[in-house]
């Protein structure tokens, strides 16, 4: 797809909004920043809002080209500064899922276009899907992400309104992420509760023919992993996580690893099998118990708590990283890191939600290919199931290992 380079701030049209004004959109009276013509929605308990911190990732709106309350098309430009002490940093870079979340101002755009005068507090925003393409490497501390987000159109299915969008993310004029075919809907509580989930069955899917399936580089691939073992992996202690056969990991100084602490979205791996799964090419299953006190419910969104699908995607990438490391693919790659395969489009679909009342998320990796080449790469379908409902699916996601600082 054509990539649009974000114009310089000075030439961008329309109103500008500061971080403080974004906080008002997230948790205050929206008419205070959009003007008195929006006062009619201030009384609604639930509105389409930007997230509150910590998930308010946009730092400023640098331009807005749209007719307020028109429910037509429009464009919004935002920036996100990746501070050196940002809470989400992993290996000095923004995680792939958090990077998608930073392009969150489609929420502010559709709000400015007047969606809540139609929702009237009875309907809430939920992402339905999009197509991602990463470019080059994940941005790092000190970079500023510049987003250009377009509202492309609207539709209606019965009482459900649909919203279509796309966006580009650039750093210093260089494309780093393209999101195409973005779809969101505005749903009642009843409609969300009656969701049939993602219509995808691995038994009916058709993975690629003649797959590249490099064998494990260790004899003893662990079949299960506890939370304490996953914490060890996040801490860079490869042997403490995976055990016998991974002794060489003790020599690593910057081993490829996953995020830890609150950014680790897995409690345990219940199955890891290089010959498992319905395709016989490899399988991993992990679980995460949900608590009402989980940090991501706080402010995402005000009066409408739900787990961002972008963080479910981040959890999926963690399961892929664990699978690659469990096969021994990182043993000889001290100083490397995980990142999405660039210049390939990945399709995400969301059809369920994680609420404070949810009990468990199951993450599954259905391996399609394992390629132990110059940049070891895993391709797999990813499925998240929430209390039995298939909530999230990504088709043929690609994750690879690349040299990190100081090797890059």
Each model region followed by its residue ranges:
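Short nucleic-acid-contacting surface segments enriched for D/E, G, S/T with interspersed K/R
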Residues: 138-146, 312, 354-362
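Non-catalytic linker/capping segments at the edges of enzyme domains
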Residues: 1-97, 118, 122-123, 133-141, ...
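Glycine-rich and small/hydrophobic secondary-structure elements
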Residues: 148-149, 364-367
């Amino acid at each position: 797809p054509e990539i649009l380079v974000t114009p310089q701030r000075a030439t961008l049209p329309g109103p500008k909004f500061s971080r403080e004004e974004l906080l008002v959109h997230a948790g205050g009276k929206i008419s205070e920043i959009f003007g008195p013509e929006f006062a009619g929605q201030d009384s609604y308990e639930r509105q389409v809002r930007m997230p509150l911190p910590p998930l308010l990732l946009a730092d400023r709106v640098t331009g807005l080209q749209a007719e307020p309350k028109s429910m037509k098309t429009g464009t919004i430009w935002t920036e996100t500064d990746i501070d050196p002490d940002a809470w989400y940093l992993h290996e000095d870079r923004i995680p792939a899922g958090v990077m998608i979340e930073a392009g969150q101002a489609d929420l502010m755009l559709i709000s400015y276009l007047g969606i809540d005068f139609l929702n009237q507090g009875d309907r809430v925003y939920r992402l339905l899907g999009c197509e991602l393409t990463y470019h080059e490497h994940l941005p790092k501390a000190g970079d500023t992400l510049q987003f250009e987000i377009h509202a492309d159109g609207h539709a209606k299915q019965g009482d459900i309104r649909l919203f279509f969008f796309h966006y580009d993310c650039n750093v210093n004029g260089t494309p780093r992420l393209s999101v195409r075919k973005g779809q969101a809907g505005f749903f009642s509580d009843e409609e969300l509760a009656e969701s049939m989930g993602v219509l995808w069955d691995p038994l009916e899917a058709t993975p690629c023919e003649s797959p590249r399936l490099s064998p494990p580089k260790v004899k003893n691939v662990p079949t299960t992993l506890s939370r304490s073992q996953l914490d060890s992996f996040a801490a860079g202690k490869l042997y403490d996580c995976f055990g016998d056969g991974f002794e060489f990991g003790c020599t690593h100084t910057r081993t490829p690893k996953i995020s830890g602490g609150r950014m680790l979205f897995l409690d345990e791996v219940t199955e890891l099998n290089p010959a498992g799964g319905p395709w016989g090419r490899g399988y991993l299953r992990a679980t995460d118990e949900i608590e009402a006190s989980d940090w991501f419910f706080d402010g995402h969104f005000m009066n409408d708590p739900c787990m961002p699908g972008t963080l479910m995607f981040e959890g999926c990438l963690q399961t892929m990283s664990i699978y690659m490391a469990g096969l021994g693919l990182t043993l000889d790659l001290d100083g490397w890191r995980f990142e999405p395969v660039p210049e390939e489009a990945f399709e995400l679909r969301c059809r369920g939600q994680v609420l404070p009342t949810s009990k468990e998320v199951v993450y599954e990796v259905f391996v399609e290919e394992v390629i132990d080449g110059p940049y070891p790469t895993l391709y797999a379908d990813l499925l998240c199931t929430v209390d039995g409902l298939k909530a999230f699916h990504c088709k043929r996601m690609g994750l690879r290992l690349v040299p990190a600082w100081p090797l890059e």
